[in-house]
A protein has these predicted regions:
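Beta-rich nucleic-acid/ligand-interaction surfaces
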Residues: 83-102
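A broadly used, surface-exposed interaction patch
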Residues: 53, 78, 103-107
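Feature for intrinsically disordered/low-complexity regulatory segments and propeptides
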Residues: 1-68
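Residues at beta-strand starts and edge strands
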Residues: 65, 91-93, 112
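Short secondary-structure junctions
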Residues: 74-86
């Protein structure tokens, strides 16, 4: 029998509200049309569980046992499970897998290795998804490719959570094409000269930061400053500049568009609060994930030819 990847799992449970009866006593009445998603330990019967979300009764959460089942089936195709976790206050779960048949890319300051990422959420933000996560092992930077959600399997978010693993050769073809397309852009970014004078402007574009007069108060009197960035954005711009100059692999990459983009991915993955990591900010559709995607588009715009 296989060991569980996750210590907890989820299930829908009925919801009740407390009501006051005419005689002054209280009782409980079921709330129809909705149910709660309860996360509880698989092995501790004393665990009363926690409610992680509330949904209409028509919504059925995909259990983590199903995610494990998919991962174990993929192991039979040659994948290796390399990581797993829960984020967003236990509302999102994921498993990462590697496969030696998927292509890598290596040059000075960079070594890219792809992983398959499968995940599901209990708040409706991710049904059941598979995508490609590329890791630069020089600096542990990550980037999710915008791949179709049917690379590894076809799935339906229903009570039975049915899925069908794609043909293995078809998996490799679709994944390989997406990865090689990304690598081609990476190589072109590495061949694109970058001038550090562009850093502040383009980092600000990634953040959506704008310079404008700011209202301040001193000695009880309000006044307006000269045009400036907000305090938060000013600090983030300092961090991004540090990442461009000092994060692992940057010197080896030289002054290239790839170095600039790598500064953003390093900042997004490593110069981040524990709270942001827990919220999933740097994966899928989180704030920092969107900033990575925006930086990628900006970097690509500098490619000539």
């Amino acid at each position: 029998m296989r060991d569980n990847i996750f210590t907890h799992d989820v299930k829908p449970v009925k919801m009740y509200r407390e009501i006051m009866n005419k005689d002054g006593s209280t009782s409980f009445e079921q709330i129809h049309g909705f149910h709660a998603v309860e996360r509880a330990s698989r092995n501790d019967l004393r665990d009363n569980g926690e409610v992680v979300y509330v949904h209409p009764s028509s919504y059925y959460p995909i259990q983590l046992e199903k995610l494990e089942e998919i991962a174990y089936e993929l192991e039979g195709f040659g994948y290796k499970i390399t990581g797993s976790g829960e984020l967003k206050d236990n509302r999102l779960a994921f498993i990462e897998l590697e496969n030696d048949d998927l292509p890598n890319l290596k040059f000075d300051g960079t070594e890219l290795n792809p992983k398959m990422w499968i995940g599901t959420s209990h708040d409706g933000s991710v049904a059941l998804k598979s995508t490609i996560k590329v890791v630069d092992t020089w600096c542990k930077n990550t980037f999710m490719l915008n791949s179709a959600s049917d690379i590894l399997f076809k799935a339906k978010h229903t009570r039975n959570s049915t899925y069908r693993i794609q043909d293995y050769q078809n998996q490799l073809r679709i994944a390989g094409e997406s990865i090689m397309e990304y690598y081609d852009i990476v190589n072109r970014l590495q061949d694109t000269k970058w001038y550090q004078s562009k850093n502040r402007k383009e980092f600000a574009n990634v953040l959506g930061a704008t310079m404008k007069p700011r209202k301040r108060k001193k000695d009880g009197k309000e006044f307006w400053t000269e045009s400036m960035y907000s305090g938060k954005h000013a600090n983030q711009l300092v961090d991004l500049d540090w990442a461009y100059n000092n994060s692992p692999g940057q010197v080896e990459r030289g002054d290239t568009a790839w170095r600039w983009f790598s500064a953003v991915t390093y900042w997004a993955d490593h110069m981040i609060s524990d709270r942001e990591i827990e919220s999933g900010s740097n994966i899928l559709n989180g704030t920092r994930a969107r900033q990575k995607a925006k930086a990628f588009d900006i970097a690509k715009s500098y490619i000539v030819g």
